[in-house]
């Protein structure tokens, strides 16, 4: 039997009292040769997977970044040969469902220590970060950066974020895991967008500075754009409109022992489209095309 995890999103484009929600749906595949072969919807009351990712109307009406949603990851966390499921949530706790076989799942979130309340979680990934043959967990968030959890091997996880060397950055979106430097352990690449946007601030004010033929945003809401949280945030497009860059992504090199270091964008690891080392972190659409 092959299974597929699908998401069915429903949202409103105008102000209503109904929250945006994303529900989990389990489908199984009928591999017989009958004309009815295909996917079959599994009853959540029988599977035990009843997770819903809710987002309050008042939140997404004032911050459209939250409408990008949240992710789910799958992996065998207890090494029993069955794939378990972890769901991330924006307005509520995350959920870990242990696969008990025969399409039955058990919610073991609290016992595992993985509910991550009030984290505004956006993405997740299972990966063996310490090489002990069990799957650890990464949880990306909108406001709290990347959270790292070590699998203790007994259906329990310990958070290692504070000592792991994670960069305190907002706007977390997705992540990927791979051994980019071929040293035998898994490294982490995290992507970011923004945690808030100018378009959600109805009363926002902008001051433009012109030097020669160059125009730039000098102030935002009466604050200079040299302030750390505003630096390199805005640009003037070819039509004269004001755009915003996303937060810079981060590649974390795994040093072992749940210790990571952020790779410098200009140390020669990353190359541009001319195969030359970057001179500054990329902004806009994401990273360069290659890692040497």
Where are these regions (language model features)?
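Bacterial N-terminal signal peptides
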Residues: 1-6
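Acidic, glycine/proline-rich Ca2+-coordinating loop motifs
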Residues: 8-292
């Amino acid at each position: 039997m092959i299974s597929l995890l699908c998401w069915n999103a429903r949202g409103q484009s105008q102000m209503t009292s109904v929250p945006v929600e994303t529900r989990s749906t389990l489908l199984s595949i009928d591999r017989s040769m009958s004309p009815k072969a295909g996917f079959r919807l599994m009853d959540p009351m029988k599977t035990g997977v009843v997770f819903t990712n809710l987002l309050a109307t008042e939140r997404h009406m004032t911050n459209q970044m939250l409408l990008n949603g949240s992710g789910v990851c799958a992996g065998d966390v207890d090494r029993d040969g069955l794939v378990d499921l972890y769901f991330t949530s924006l307005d509520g706790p995350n959920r870990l469902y242990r696969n008990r076989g025969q399409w039955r799942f058990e919610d073991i979130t609290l016992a595992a220590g993985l509910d991550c309340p009030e984290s505004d979680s956006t993405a997740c990934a299972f990966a063996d970060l310490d090489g002990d043959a069990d799957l650890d967990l990464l949880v990306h968030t909108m406001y709290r950066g990347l959270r790292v959890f070590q699998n203790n091997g007994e259906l329990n996880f310990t958070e290692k974020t504070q000592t792991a060397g994670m960069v305190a950055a907002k706007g977390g979106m997705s992540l990927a895991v791979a051994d980019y430097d071929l040293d035998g352990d898994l490294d982490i690449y995290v992507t970011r967008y923004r945690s808030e946007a100018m378009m959600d601030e109805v009363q926002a004010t902008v001051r433009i500075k012109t030097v020669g033929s160059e125009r730039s945003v000098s102030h935002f809401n009466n604050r200079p754009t040299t302030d750390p949280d505003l630096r390199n945030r805005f640009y003037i497009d070819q039509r004269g409109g004001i755009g915003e860059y996303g937060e810079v992504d981060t590649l974390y090199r795994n040093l072992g022992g749940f210790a990571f270091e952020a790779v410098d964008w200009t140390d020669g690891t990353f190359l541009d489209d001319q195969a030359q080392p970057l001179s500054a972190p990329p902004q806009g659409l994401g990273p360069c095309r290659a890692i040497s």
